[in-house]
């Protein structure tokens, strides 16, 4: 096949199919399709397989032996990259009025990027667009928004027009602050917030460029530190998380005013507040003795920032809690608060949580931290009542390999009964007198007995059996009688039968067979039948005697007049025919049956 079948498509969905010989080049293909798309060949750009085709490339190098229909994408450029000149940019005549400036600005046609690759635009085309943008903003009085546009034009080989260079607005391009003071720009900024934001961004860019060019001329204001190297705490330095932010030099990093603040709460910098039930922490005092040295890489200055001294931390208590409940044993007048027994060899932790940016390096972490909370428990006043609260340092913390400690657990609040018991160790603390006059503890020695869960595992079935014995006392009296009968019975078969019945009834009443009985439908149907027999027997036993009233009737037959055919009369007749011994025997049999049926438990 000596020709290629090429389909050319444009952005506006215009399609053309052409038969092109294999020996043609890309430029000859452009000349062939230029008539169809009504554009000169030098403004046409063909794209195939994501590449812009060069004019001198033969089609055989691109399509090789393709026999099917091949698709090329066509882009029509607005300006000719080889012959485009800058209109009205080289004009030497200076306009005399604002109308002539706007007319010269509008003489530049609005460019429209039709190429799929922005890099294809030449430097001259990009410079044209920059100049058009500057002219449009300068005509409206907003030329100060682009202070660096003349540098961009110079990088592309262009310069501002003569009338623009001589204008007072062009002379103030480097000073964006002075241009912001113009009343026309101030009015536009009030009306349009987006222009105001653009002006602020342009001012920041100008400041950054000045700092980049002249880093030595920029003077950074630093906050002086106190003579005692104590941090200055203000309302701006205290965050919502409760951390204490240390004083810092603003010259280190102008974009981060506080280099030592942390959004995470550090329990090491606080003491437990006695009036806070949720265990939140109060801020630390300003005393400090450890200085951290931070080196500024840019200026080489050394700033000593104090670190809080953990040994001088003092407790904070509310006025509603008496003073004798202070965690400090030196201030505690009542010896019972510090004599709470403990079975741990190391009751207090030797370290605390240091997973905070305030302790940035492990070299600043002391190996042995003073004890913050020397007692296990404290009283808190909440909703008019006193409660016991376990302190966070009741158990030694876990130390990891990176010399950091596990976070402290939140203090637990007990019930208003005022008793706190450790189930693992058996240690107890009681609020002996929960009133404002005598709030103190009564400790109890730990008991090293069987754990509670082990005790309940073995004693629960026996307690369950005792409760069943109390609930079914009459039934177990009958079982005791069964035991007597089986003991003095000479027949082995009767003894085995009675013993098995007694065992089954015992298991039924204790509930040991409940899982098997409740899930077996056959046993459930048998139990329902036995309960029905019990109900029928009790109904017959508890019914009242019926009175038979004879009403004489002349139309009755002889048998009816005699009354021999009625059921009650027949039962009475049979009862009269029995002897006294027979009646006693029938009563005993019925009693035994009722006694046997009473063993079946009722629902």
From Swiss-Prot:
SMART domains, per the entry: UBQ
SUPFAM superfamilies per the UniProt record, alphabetical: Ubiquitin-like (SSF54236)
Compositionally biased tracts (Basic and acidic residues): 569-578
Membrane-related topology note: Single-pass membrane protein
Residue numbers bearing the Phosphothreonine modification: 566
Any Pfam family the entry gives: ubiquitin
Chain segments annotated as transmembrane: 496-516
Domain Ubiquitin-like: 4-79
UniProt subcellular location: Endoplasmic reticulum membrane
Source domain of life: Eukaryota
Cysteines paired by S-S bonds: none
Disordered: region residues: 85-121, 159-178, 206-348, 544-578
GO BP term (any one): ubiquitin-dependent protein catabolic process
GO molecular function: polyubiquitin modification-dependent protein binding
Gene3D superfamilies linked to this entry: Phosphatidylinositol 3-kinase Catalytic Subunit, Chain A, domain 1
Cellular component per GO, a single term: endoplasmic reticulum
Protein name: Uncharacterized ubiquitin-like protein C1E8.02
Organism (species): Schizosaccharomyces pombe (strain 972 / ATCC 24843) (Fission yeast)
Lineage, broadest ranks: Eukaryota, Fungi, Dikarya, Ascomycota, Taphrinomycotina
